[in-house]
Amino acid sequence: MCLCINKNAEFEKAEKDIVYYKVLEREKDETFPFIHKYKTPYMGVEVKLRKRYDENEEAETKELFFSDYIEKGVIHLFANYDNAVDRADRTRNGCVVKAVIPKGSEYIKGYFYPAIGCSVPSIGTKSVIYKRVVYKR
């Protein structure tokens, strides 16, 4: 998934914990039917709730018409709940998880791509804690 950013956008440091939203795919665990597994819809990375994840790969910025975009090197989050729900509804077994960028972590503001015109406010972060499911289909 890509994050469109303004040409002059820079990473900021979180002065406090910041709440955003992550869309994940949710599947039942075959060995424990009341437990679910979660994975990222684009990269297919399995994640666990209440655990911190850090992106160690360098963020690579590329040109895209009138803006730039970051393809990898950040963890993508939605800036608002309604946009996350809309994307979860378009994702196989989609759900929305409350995601916290921990104080002191780097993040960059941008827009979700492939949304038409890169118009859905989104965030790219180097660190995140997935807290709990706040929406499921």
Residue ranges and their predicted role:
Residues 1-75, 81-137:
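Conserved NAD+-utilizing ADP-ribose enzyme module
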